[in-house]
Structure formats: structure tokens, C-alpha cells
Curated annotation (Swiss-Prot):
Cofactor binding note of this UniProt entry: Binds 1 pyridoxal phosphate per subunit.
Lineage: Bacteria, Bacillati, Cyanobacteriota, Cyanophyceae, Synechococcales
Required cofactor names: pyridoxal 5'-phosphate
Catalytically driven reaction(s): N(2)-acetyl-L-ornithine + 2-oxoglutarate = N-acetyl-L-glutamate 5-semialdehyde + L-glutamate
Protein name: Acetylornithine aminotransferase
PANTHER family listed in its UniProt record: ACETYLORNITHINE AMINOTRANSFERASE, MITOCHONDRIAL (PTHR11986:SF79), AMINOTRANSFERASE CLASS III (PTHR11986)
Length: 419
């Protein structure tokens, strides 16, 4: 075997360091110079043996942490039983997970796929068909929020209210218009302008908490307004719960914080506990799909659904909703103390449960990326949500002592900035 010339190998640059080793991976990620080789609970180890407290959890996916004993045992057994068959046949594991999701939510039926973007694509198709069948709209429009994020596939990207993700991928999919988050007047003005002459709007798509957009928490009055407005105008209310769902906020579903039920909502990330799965959950009134309207080769496979059901039951059995609520409050209080200690840099705590962000003041020269880099040196993994928000999404199993460690190491980052 002949080594490939270095000129053909991509390299990943990193602020303040030399490029990492050549790679044959397509250059789509600005990777950090950190090679993770092992995980256990809320902790990760790199190839040198250095230990890190993980406040990223695979970006809100590893709900039970890493190498969970129960999940590992169940999935090992499932691998020896059956991994995948086609949706041409009934899949018991899929039906079991669907039943659990329906029993625990406002939905009546479930479609399974492999990711959040896929789930949102399914929701977009659902809304378009609903608009055509129920409202007689030939070219339905979906209203989405500014600063939202719904995925990288083309329709989900087009529904995303952040142009920085869309640049270079035009023409975008048509049929999306944008309103200001938590602004009922913005929604009403946009809707009325679009529907001056004929019905054009099929649905409103929104995140209860904007994750990539900066951990912006929805306002209860605004979500009451959305539900009422959609009812009055016979349009669907769709929630993107890809990041907020499965207990991340201290409640199983983000919509529970508002006492507002969507007509359909999407899940992924935390549902699989680190394994690929997504879902669209639909109420009966929005169940417009027929056989052949949508499909997924791998969606709902036995392995992924066994992972999802195990995660779901462990969240219940270990009382992780209460743990998320308590540890989220502990983390919030600690972050507020950081703001008090570094008021020239920090502004506010955003989010809820274990989906929290620490906002940096706009006039500060500090960026979230700088804190991410400093945190790595302190043995802590955090991520950004834009340039001015430090995001923390630890596993739902995180302990009181581990939250204390997180805060101590984060404080060390800011202390170094002052020195």
C-alpha cells in the first residue's frame, strides 16, 4: 500500500495551533485538535489519556451519558437478534417505541427516520400536503422564525431563519417566510400580507427553544397566541423538538412548559442516546399522509428503536426529569454567579433545564470559540451557539458534584482572561 501524497490530504486548521494530521474526510467541519477515544458517564478521554467533563453530550444526544451499562447491554443483545429489516414488514421494536411516544405525548401516530433534518423534512412535506388538501393551496407557504435552525438538508435549510447557513446553496426551496421569534405582531402582519387575496399559508414551524440560534426561550403568551391563531385559520402548528425533546428541558417535551400542544412535532438527538434516530409525531387532525407519501430505508429499524425505547424507559426509571430540573437550576445559579464575577464580559443565562447558554456581551471582544478553546485546556467540553453564546448540554445523568466541577473549570477560563 502506497501512502497518499500530503498534497491530496485535507488538513484541519485551528486557532492558535498548527494543522492536525492529514485526513481523507471531506472538509465540512472545523474540528478541534482533540481525538476522543473513550467515554464513561459524563466523562471523555483523549488519546493521551487526558480526561474531560463532557458538557456537550454529542450536541444533546447522549442523554444517558457514554457507555451506559443498561443501554450497552440491551443493544448488544439486539445486535445478536436483528439489526435491520425493511418497513415493508412489521417491526415490533418500532411499534413498541411508537406506542411509548404516543402514550407520553399529545400525538396519535409516529413516522421514524434517522435524524432531525429528516424529521423536519417529513414535517415540511406533511404541512404542504395539508395545505393542498385542507386549504386548497397549490403552492403552500410555511412560516418560520428568524434565528431558527431546522437542519442542513435543502428544505430544512430553507426553513432555517439564518442566512449564514444558506449562503452558497441558492436557489433555496421556495415556500418559506420568516417572522420575529416571540413577536405576535410579526406573525400576524406576515400572515395577513400573504393571505390578502387567497389562502397561501399551510403551517407555522417553530422551536420551543432556539438552540443554534442562541438558546432563546419561547414566551408562553406568544405560544398561546400561535396555538389560537393556527386554530382560527386552520393551519398547522409544528414544533421542532429535535434538541429540546426527550427530557432535555426538565420536562419530557419542550411544549409542556407552555401548556400548548402542537399538531405535530419532530424529535431526534436525545431520543437515541447517541444512536441515529429521528421521528415525526402527529396528531390525528394532521395525519394527512397515505402509503407512498413518505418513506425511509433505515428509519425505524429494530436497533435504533430498541435504543430509543431503552433511553425512554431509563429517563423514567432513573427519574432523570427531576435530575435535569435540579441540576439545571444548580447550573443556572452557578452561571449567574459567573456573570456577577465577570460583568464586563457576560450578560445573561439563557435556556432551561440542561439546555443552557451563557450570553457574552456584544461589546466584549470575547467570543464563544475562545471559551471553547480555553475550556479544553481546563478539561471541560462546551460549545458555542453563535459567536456570543456558550452552550452547555451535559448528559441528563450529570451529578451535583459534576456540575460543581463544570462551574469550577468554566470559572478558571474567565479567570485566565483577567490575568
Amino acid at each position: 500500500m502506497v501512502d497518499a501524497p500530503h498534497s491530496k490530504c485535507g488538513t484541519f486548521g485551528f486557532v492558535g495551533s498548527s494543522p492536525t494530521a492529514p485526513t481523507f474526510l471531506l472538509d465540512t467541519y472545523k474540528r478541534l485538535p482533540l481525538k476522543i477515544v473513550k467515554g464513561n458517564g459524563c466523562w471523555l478521554w483523549d488519546e493521551t489519556g487526558k480526561k474531560y467533563l463532557d458538557a456537550v453530550a454529542g450536541i444533546a444526544t447522549c442523554s444517558l451519558g457514554h457507555s451506559d451499562k443498561k443501554l450497552s447491554k440491551v443493544l448488544s443483545q439486539q445486535l445478536r437478534k436483528i439489526q435491520h429489516v425493511s418497513n415493508l414488514y412489521r417491526i415490533p421494536e418500532q411499534e413498541d417505541l411508537a406506542q411509548w411516544l404516543v402514550n407520553q405525548s399529545c400525538a396519535d401516530s409516529v413516522f421514524f427516520c434517522n435524524s432531525g433534518a429528516e424529521a423536519n423534512e417529513a414535517a415540511i412535506k406533511l404541512a404542504r400536503k395539508y395545505g393542498q388538501i385542507k386549504r386548497g393551496i397549490k403552492r403552500p407557504i410555511i412560516l418560520s422564525a428568524k434565528s431558527s435552525f431546522h437542519g442542513r438538508t435543502l428544505a430544512a435549510l430553507s426553513a432555517t431563519g439564518q442566512t449564514k447557513y444558506q449562503k452558497g446553496f441558492e436557489p433555496l426551496v421556495e415556500g418559506f417566510e420568516f417572522f420575529s421569534f416571540n413577536d405576535s405582531n410579526s406573525v400576524q402582519d406576515l400572515y395577513e400580507n400573504l393571505e390578502k387575496d387567497e389562502p397561501r399559508v399551510a403551517a407555522i414551524l417553530i422551536e420551543p427553544i432556539q438552540g443554534e440560534g442562541g438558546l432563546n426561550l419561547g414566551d408562553q403568551k406568544f405560544f398561546y397566541f400561535l396555538r389560537d391563531y393556527c386554530n382560527k385559520n386552520n393551519i398547522l402548528l409544528l414544533f421542532d423538538e429535535v434538541q429540546s425533546g426527550m427530557g432535555r428541558t426538565g420536562k419530557l417535551w419542550g411544549y409542556e412548559h407552555f401548556n400548548v400542544e402542537p399538531d405535530a412535532f419532530t424529535l431526534a438527538k436525545g431520543l437515541g442516546g447517541g444512536h441515529s434516530i429521528g421521528a415525526l409525531l402527529v396528531k390525528e387532525n394532521a395525519s394527512i399522509f397515505e402509503p407512498g407519501d413518505h418513506a425511509s430505508t433505515f428509519g425505524g429499524n429494530p436497533f435504533a428503536c430498541k435504543a430509543g425505547l431503552t433511553v425512554a424507559k431509563e429517563i423514567q426509571n432513573r427519574n432523570l426529569l427531576e435530575n435535569t430540573y435540579c441540576r439545571g437550576n444548580q447550573l443556572r445559579e452557578g452561571l449567574q454567579k459567573l456573570i456577577n464575577n465577570y460583568p464586563h464580559h457576560l450578560e445573561e443565562v439563557r435556556g432551561i433545564g440542561l439546555m443552557l447558554g451563557l450570553a457574552i456581551k456584544k461589546n466584549s471582544n470575547l467570543t464563544s470559540q475562545k471559551i471553547v478553546e480555553l475550556a479544553i485546556k481546563e478539561g471541560l467540553l462546551v460549545i458555542g451557539a453563535g459567536e456570543k453564546v456558550i452552550r452547555m448540554l451535559p448528559p441528563l445523568i450529570i451529578t451535583k458534584r459534576e456540575i460543581e466541577t463544570l462551574l469550577t473549570r468554566l470559572n478558571a477560563c474567565f479567570r485566565k482572561l483577567n490575568n
